[in-house]
């Protein structure tokens, strides 16, 4: 079973289209929509699907919201060790049949952690560079000061399944037991670097991330204002410092040192 988790920060229109594309009542997976804004419209949209779970209450960041949804799944459904969680952004476009084929492929390969090829347009001419190398301090400095991201992996030259360092949280398929084993997302972050941190801990725990280029989805990525005076920039800077500081102390023996609903 695959538990698909979608977090909404006011993304009613995107989620309506996504649920239509995925056939939200399909028996092969269970969709959980976590509403960060207690939207009546979103609740009404979700009520059209008998097999969908809608949960709300409280305003949190990316990682915290996803942890809440995973904890809900853990308590209500008691997933098997080999079940999966798919963290899916609301602005992803993927057809039902394509997702099922991808899931079956990953299961056949026994990949514990994987992602696919994301594009930013329906013509599939613009890549979303969602798989990257783990950043170091100099990478963040160059990115902030010059707008150049040296950690991007050139996906155009990858034609077969490849192990990569990390992938964006917009599309992550991870074995349920492995996610819980590393205590999920670190809730000490807010909106930035949660995905890098999670991928690092999974890597340290021996869980390899496979990039599967043969499967595609569309991601209408929205990039926040990164000017030095913006709130998004301050969040990003704070998360960067946290990642760089904690990278030095993390190991596969001390994941309990993160802030998570799985380890209060």
Swiss-Prot record:
CDD domains: GT_2_like_c. InterPro entries: Glyco_trans_2-like, Nucleotide-diphossugar_trans. This is Rhamnosyltransferase WbbL. Pathway: Bacterial outer membrane biogenesis; lipopolysaccharide biosynthesis. Transmembrane segments: none annotated. Coiled coil: none annotated. Rhamnosyltransferase involved in lipopolysaccharide biosynthesis. Gene3D superfamilies: Spore Coat Polysaccharide Biosynthesis Protein SpsA, Chain A (3.90.550.10). Its EC number is 2.4.1.-. Keywords: Glycosyltransferase, Lipopolysaccharide biosynthesis, Transferase. GO terms for biological process: lipopolysaccharide biosynthetic process; polysaccharide biosynthetic process. SUPFAM superfamilies: Nucleotide-diphospho-sugar transferases. One of its GO terms (molecular function) is hexosyltransferase activity. It comes from the Bacteria. Belongs to the glycosyltransferase 2 family.
């Amino acid at each position: 079973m695959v538990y698909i988790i979608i977090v909404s920060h006011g993304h009613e229109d995107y989620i309506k289209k996504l649920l239509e594309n995925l056939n939200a009542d399909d028996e092969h997976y269970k969709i959980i929509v976590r509403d960060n804004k207690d939207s009546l419209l979103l609740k009404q949209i979700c009520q059209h699907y008998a097999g969908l779970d809608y949960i709300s209450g409280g305003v949190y960041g990316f990682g915290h919201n996803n942890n809440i949804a995973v904890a809900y799944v853990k308590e209500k459904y008691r997933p098997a060790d080999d079940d999966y969680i798919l963290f899916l952004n609301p602005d992803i476009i993927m057809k039902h049949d394509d997702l099922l084929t991808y899931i079956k492929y990953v299961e056949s390969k026994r990949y514990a952690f994987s992602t696919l090829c994301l594009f930013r347009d329906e013509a599939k001419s613009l890549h979303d560079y969602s798989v990257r190398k783990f950043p170091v301090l100099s990478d963040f400095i160059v990115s902030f000061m010059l707008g150049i991201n040296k950690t991007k992996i050139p996906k155009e030259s990858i034609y077969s399944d490849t192990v990569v360092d990390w992938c964006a949280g917009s599309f992550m398929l991870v074995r349920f037991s492995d996610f819980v084993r590393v205590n999920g997302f670190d809730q000490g972050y807010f909106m930035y670097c949660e995905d890098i941190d999670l991928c690092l801990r999974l890597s340290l725990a021996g869980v390899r991330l496979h990039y599967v280029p043969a499967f595609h989805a569309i991601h209408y990525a929205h990039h926040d204002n990164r000017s030095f005076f913006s709130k998004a920039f301050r969040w990003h800077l704070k998360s960067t410092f946290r990642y760089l500081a904690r990278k030095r102390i993390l190991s596969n023996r001390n994941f309990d040192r993160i802030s998570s609903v799985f380890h209060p």
